């Protein structure tokens, strides 16, 4: 077998039997969790395909290790390698202190135009949870990754730049509601039609491909009408223009209510559901954050903007065990580029202690295997995690919250996962 690059074809990814996949080991606990995760991934691939498939891992540098080695936090060589090989896995990265790059994670997403942050959230039986029915949580979050207030267009209070911006807003645009202009910092919130459409398109296509029931557009369009309100409307418009015969939208529902009454609208939605159509609906963000606690089963795939998505994905993760078991991916569905990553931080006080839960980066690698079409290997890891947690052999974060648990190290947890691969 010869290791080869993954390429992007007209119908999606072309994945060889021995793909070369770059990885960033990460800072802090990164080496601990990556050593565990890579062993589990390799064992699952071997078990699933009897040696006919394997991954050749290629280390690239970012974060503290890159800075110590090259003097750069995010070397151009790393970006070029990921661009060339399309798919990568990464551990948590520290945020550089001082000027320049504000966040290495954001820089990677923007440089590679990874417009979707994919965050599936589900509960594994036995995982400690603060809610009564964590099993009702089964959502997939599509968070827009490149726009919104996280675009990084900010001007610090007191600078020449912010004074120019405020002067322009007040004197050219007639903005009178900057309450304290002399001491305000300013951030810009870009939300585009193109950015919205490619995110919502990916979310709806995912729902169709994975037999999901609905896509909820989460927004604050009631307040921010020309950014978040436009996101909602562009999302609905895209759903009908590109997926018209496969979806039923709440805007269609409202039109039927107006013309024929609510009974007719309810009947139309029930008919659409029976036909397997995806229901496209929307929710104001603050109401949505209540509903994921009070009735999470009503939501399935979620499409939302950058800031809302950040809050929602971590709030949901808390309901099913925390970010230690929350997978994540950053994907450009058009170019094929994707980075699969641990969703937690570097936890430097635990670095090198062989103590923390490696499940986030392992489950993110499950997303990668699914993305490659290697479903058999992905399922083996997921099933093993379910069985291992159910047997109460867990790392310290779960052991302290479970009766009768056996606390094990990071590496021993990986050993247990490998043992339980079926």
Swiss-Prot record:
One of its GO terms (biological process) is tricarboxylic acid cycle. SUPFAM superfamilies: Isocitrate/Isopropylmalate dehydrogenase-like. The record marks 150, 220 as: Critical for catalysis. NADP(+) binds at residues 94, 344-350, 357, 396, 400. Its EC number is 1.1.1.42. Its cofactor is Mg(2+); Mn(2+). It catalyses: D-threo-isocitrate + NADP(+) = 2-oxoglutarate + CO2 + NADPH. Mg(2+) binds at residue 310. GO terms for molecular function: isocitrate dehydrogenase (NADP+) activity; magnesium ion binding; NAD binding. Pfam families: Iso_dh. Binds 1 Mg(2+) or Mn(2+) ion per subunit. Keywords: Glyoxylate bypass, Magnesium, Manganese, Metal-binding, NADP, Oxidoreductase, Tricarboxylic acid cycle. Gene3D superfamilies: Isopropylmalate Dehydrogenase. D-threo-isocitrate binds at residues 103, 105, 109, 119, 143. Catalyzes the oxidative decarboxylation of isocitrate to 2-oxoglutarate and carbon dioxide with the concomitant reduction of NADP(+). Belongs to the isocitrate and isopropylmalate dehydrogenases family. Homodimer. This is Isocitrate dehydrogenase [NADP]. It comes from Staphylococcus aureus (strain MSSA476). The lineage of its organism: Bacteria, Bacillati, Bacillota, Bacilli, Bacillales.
